[in-house]
Amino acid sequence: MKNKFILPCCIALLPLMANAAGDITGKVLNKGTGEPMDFVTIQLINAKTNKPLSIGTATQEDGSFILPHVSDGEYIVKISNIGSIDQERPVTIHNGNVDIGEIHLADDAKLLQEVVVEGIRSQMRFELDRKIFSVDANVTAAGTSASELLESIPSVEVDQDGEVSLRGNSSVTIWINGKESGLTADNRAQILEQIPAETIDRIEVITNPSAKYSPEGTAGIINIVLKKDRKAGYYGSAELSVNSRGGGNAGFNFNYSSGKVDAFAGIGFRMRHNKGGSFMKREFTDGSYTNSSGESPNHGNNLFLRLGATWHITDFDDLSASGFGMLGHRWGHSLTDYTSNVPGNWIRNYDYSRNRGDMRGAHAELGYTHKWTESRLIDITAAYNHWGGPSWRSYEQDITYENPAFDPSLPENDSDNPRYLFEDIYQEQNMDMGTNSWEVKADYTNQINEIFKLEAGYNGNFSKEDSPTETYMGTSKEDMTIAPNLFNRFIYRNNIHALYATFGGKIKSFSFSAGLRSESWQVRTRSLSYGETISDVPVFKKNNFALFPSVFLSLSLPYDNEMQINYTRRLRRPWGGQLNSFRDISDPTNISYGNPELQPQYSNSFELNYIKSWTWHMISLSAYMRTTSNMMNRISYLDGDVMYTTWANVADEINSGCEIVVKNNFINRIDLTTTVNLYNNHISAWDFDFLSENGNVIPLSGRKQNSFAWDARMMASVRLPWSLSFQATGNYNSKMLSAQGSRQGGWSVDIGVRKNIGNWSLSLNCRDLFDSRKFKSTTNGPDYTQYNERWRGGRTIRFTVKYSFGNMKSKPNKKGDGEPMDGSGYGDMDM
C-alpha cells in the first residue's frame, strides 16, 4: 500500500525533475568608484535565439540581484544602466545555481552627456514621413504651454484665439500620443493652453500622412508626444518656473523601467496671467464709421496629471494602460469702447464683459500587443476621452443714442428736450459643453521578407458633443430674465469607421508604398430652442463615404542624396460649432453662427522632397501642391449695423509652395537652423445670394485671388563655456490674402539661456522680446472696409530651475562637444 502511494508521487515529480532550475545571482559595482549600483536592469536572453526573455529584475541598494528559478539551458545576462556601457555575461544552468560574481560598469561619457546636458541635443530631425522637434533641446520652451511651444515650430502658426495652422492652412489635425484624444476644434485651444511644455517629449509634424493615418486635416497632422521612456532604471525630474506676469509652473516627472514592467507618472501645475486687447476700425463708402478699442486680460490655473505602465507578460505579449487628465479654471474680462456716426445708429457703446469657466478632461487608454515574430505583430488599443466643463459670461452695455426728436432751438433738458438717449442692457450666458468619445484601433504589421511589408487595420472613432447654452437679459442685473430666442442646446454625434491597407517594399535604393483607406461616417445634429426637448426636434442626418489613396516613392542617390515623391487624398470635416446655427452674441456688433448645411471639403496633396547632407551641413527642399474643391470658408455680411459671420462652401483653391530647411554647424559650437516656407494661394471667383436672419437677400461675392506669401524662422543655438547654452528664435510671417480680405504680416523674437550645474539646470528666457506678436487683418465688403488688430500675451520673462535624478553613480562629463550629423540619408536625419 505504501509503495502504491510512493510510485504515483515519483511519477508526478518527473516533470519537475526534467525541468530542473537554478538561480542566477551577482553584484553590480561602478567601475570608477567601486560603489554598489542600485536599480540597474538585469535582463535574460536566450543564447540560441538571441531573443530577450520575460525574466528580468533590477539590482538592490547593495548592487546585488537574483534571477530565480531559471530553467536549465544556455543564456546571456545583459546588464544595462543609464549613463553606463552595457555588459553581457554568458551563463549555463545545469541542475544548480550560478553566481556570476561582480560586474563593474564603466561610465559612457557620451551617453551621460546626452542625458544631463540637454542643451546640446538636436532640435530637429527628419524621418521618412515627418519632421520631429525635440522639446528638451528648446531652451525658450522652459515654463511655457503646448500652445506657446507650437509657435516655435517651423511652418506652424498659432493665432490670437489659439487656433493652429500649418503652412498657412488652418485645416490641421492635432493628436496627443498618436491619437485624437478627444481634441476637437471646439476645445483644443483650451486644452493646448493647459498642457505644460515640460510634460512633452517631442512634436512630430506630418505634412502628408499615408493611408494608415486619418485623412482629417488637409494641411496634415501635428502629433504631440508626451514623455514616456524605456531607459533602464529609475529617473525623473522636478521643475519650478516663475514669470514676469505673476504666473508660473511646477512639475514632477518619474520613470521606472525593468525587464518586466515599465512605468511613468507626472504631475504639473500651471498658473497664467496674460494681457490682451483689440482695435477695430470699420469705414463705409458714405464716409461713416464704427470704431472700437479695448483690453481683455485673462487668467487661469490648471492641474495636469499623466501616468501609465506596460507589463511585458511574455516575450511576445505586452499589456499597457495609460492616461492623462486635467482640471482647470479660467477667468477674465474685456472692456471695449465703441464709437459710431452711422446714421440712425448709437454714437457710443460701452461694453464690459466678464467670463469664467472650468475645464475637466481625461484620456484613458488600454493597449495590447502580440508578436508572432519580431517582424509580425498586432497592436490593439481602446481609449475613452471626456472633455468639458461649465462656463459663464456676462455682458453690460451702456449705449448712447442721439435723440431724433431733439430741438436745438430749445434749451437742452434731460427730461423734456434731451440731446442724448441712454439705454442699459445686461446679459448673462451660461454654457456647459461636454464631449465624450471612444477610439478603437487595431493595427496589423507583417514584414513579409527583407523586401516587402504589409500593414492593415481598423480605426473607429465615436464622439458626442452636448453644449447647452442659455442667456438672460434685462435693463439691470436685478430684472434679468431668460431670453428664449437666445437659448440653445446643440447635440452633435459623429461616428467614423475606417479600414486601411498599405503595401510597401525596398529594392536596392528604391522604396515604395501604396495604400488605400476607406471611411464611412455618420453625422447627427440637433439644435434645440427654448422649451424644446430632444423628441420635439428632428435629427439632422448626414451619411458619407469616401476613399483615400496614398502613394509614396523614394530613391536613395549616391553621396547622401535622397529624393521622395508622394500623393495623398485628404479631407476637412465640419466640426460642431461650424454646424450650429446658434448666434454668438459675445460682441453685439460682430455676431457669428454656424451653418448646418456645410459640406466636407476634399483635397489632393502632392509633395516632392529632396535632401542632401554633408558632415556638418544639410539642406532639405520640399515642393508641394494641394488642390481643394468646395472649400469651407468664413463669409461675412453686413445687415443693418451688425456684422454677421458664418460658414459656407465657396470656391475652389490651389495651394502650392516650397519649404526650404538649411542646417549649419559651425566650429562645433553654433547650430543654425533656417526654415523658409514660400507658398502661393489661388482662390477661384464665387458669388451667391444669401438670405439673412432678418429676411434680407444679400448678394455676396468673392473675386478671384492669387496671392503669394511666405514665412521664415531661424533658430540659433550656441554652446558656451561653463556648461552654458544660448538660443534665439526669430519668426516672420508675410501678408496673406483671405476669401474677403487679408491678414497682415507679423514678426517676433524669443531668446533663452540655460546653465547646467551637475543635476541642476537653470533657464532664463524671454518670449516675444519686442512685444510684437499681434494679429492684424482687413475685411472688404460691398460698401465697407474693416481693419482688426488683436493681441494677447505680450513680452514675458521666465526663470526655470530643474533638478534631474536617477540611478547614475558618477558625475557626467560636462564637456559640450558637438557631433557630426548622421549622413545616412532621409530615413533618420538629425538637425
Region spans (language model):
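Short, acidic Ser/Thr/Gly-rich low-complexity loop/linker segments typical of extracellular
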Residues: 48-64
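Face-selective signature of the C-terminal outer-membrane beta-barrel domain
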Residues: 306-328, 355-528, 556, 560, ...
